[in-house]
Amino acid sequence: MRRLFFFLSHLSVLYREDSSGTMNRTPGRRRRTMRLRDTGLTAEELKEMVNKYMVETYERYDFIAERAEGMYLYDEKGMPYLDFYGGVAVNSPGNCNPEVVKAAKDQMDDIMHTFNYPYTIPQALLAKKVCETIGMDKIFYQNSGTEANECMIKMARKYGTDHYGPEKYHIITAKKGFHGRTFGSMAATGQPDTAIQQGFGPMLEGFSYARYNDLNDFASKVTENTIAIMIEPVQGEGGVYPATQEFMEGLRKLCDEKGLLLLLDEVQTGWGRTGTPMAYMGYGVKPDIVSMAKAMGGGMPIGACCATDEVARVFTAGTHGSTYAGHAVACAAALASVTEILDKDLSGNARRVGRYLKQELSKLPHVKDVRGKGLLVGCEYDIPIAVEVKHEALERRVLFTAIGDSVNRMIPPLIATKKDVDQLIRVMRESIDEAAAKYLDMKMAG
C-alpha cells in the first residue's frame, strides 16, 4: 500500500556530493507515515493537544483520521469511514490517489520550491493542460480558493481602471454566495449578517448583492461604476442551488451588452464535480475570468485564476504575485489530478452516480427537496434535523456535511459508485429516523 511521508523534510532520498561536485541520490531509510501509536499519545491526549494549541474555528469530527484511500478514511483503530464530503470537494480523484501521490513524491526528489523566477516543468505542463482543456488563454497560479478569487477580483478591477478609469471597480455578486474568508473574497460573499463578515470592521467597498437566479435583480444593480458580475455556477455554502440555464445565458448577454466581465467562481464546482470539466462548459457559457482550486490539486493545496488574453494582459510585473504560488510539487500533483479526472472520465461518473444519488435521496423520509449538479448534491428536510443527521451518520462511520439546520450536502470523491450510494442511503435512513425522533420528542417536551 502506498504511503505518504509524514512531512516534507522526511524524504526517502538522501543526498551526497561526489568528487565532481554534483549531487547524487542514494537510497535513504523509508519513514513510516505517522501513526498514533508512534506518538506515545492516547486518542484523547491528542485531541486535548489540538484543543489546547489550535485556534478553534472548526467543528471537529470525533475521530482521528490516520490515513485515507479511495472512498474511505481510516481512524487510529483502522476503522473505515465512508467519505461523502471528500475533504470538502478536494479529493475528487479519490483519497490519496496513487497517481497524485506518486507525482508529488517524484517531484520532491527533483525540486520543490524556487519562486517564479526560473521556468519549471510542472508549471508549464499544467498551464498547457488547464488552458487547453477549459478553453482559456492564461493561468495565474495561487495556493487556495480564496486566493484565486482575490486574484480574480484584482484582475477585474485592474481591467476596469485600465480601460475605463479608476471609478470602474464595482462588482455585483449573489446573495447567499460564498467566495472566501480573506478581505476581498469576504466582501464579495453575499452573507453580511453571518459570522463570515460580522466583527471584522468595514468590508472592502465596491460590492453589491443581487438575488441568485434573478436576472432582473442583477441588471438592476448595474451602475456606471460596475465592471463585473461574479457568481458560483452552483451555490455550495448557500444551500446547493444550481444556476438555471436561462440565468447563466442571461448573465453572459447582460455582461456583453453592458461591457462587463463575467467572473465565475469554480473553486468547488471545477474539475468534474458537476458533470463537465468546468461547470460553465455544461451551460455553454464562457466567462472572462474563472477561479479554481480544491479538486485541481487532488489533495495538495493549489488554486488558479484563468482568463482570456484581453483581460489577463492587465497584469504586468509587480501588479500581483505570490511566493508559493506555482509550487513545483503542487503543480505536479495537480497535473496528475487533472489528468486522472479527464482520462478516467470522472465527470461522466459524476453525472451518472449523481443522478442515482438524487433519485435515492428523494425517497428518504422528511426529504422535501433534492438539488444539485453531478456529485454536488443538497438534501433538504421538512424539519431542522441536518446537523443531527450528520452526527448520527458519523456514529455509523459515514461522513457528509450540514449547511444550516435543514440541508445536508454530499460532495464525495468523483470515483463514488452506486454501491457507495446504497451504503450512504442505508445509513441516512437510520440517521434521519433517529434525528427526527429526537426533534419531535424535544418539540413535544418544549
How would you label these PLM feature ranges?
Residues 34-446:
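Conserved N-terminal phosphate-binding loop of PLP-dependent enzymes in the Aspartate aminotransferase
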Residues 3-7:
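Extreme N-terminal basic, low-complexity initiation segments
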Residues 8-33:
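Short, Lys/Arg-enriched N-terminal segments with co-localized hydrophobic residues
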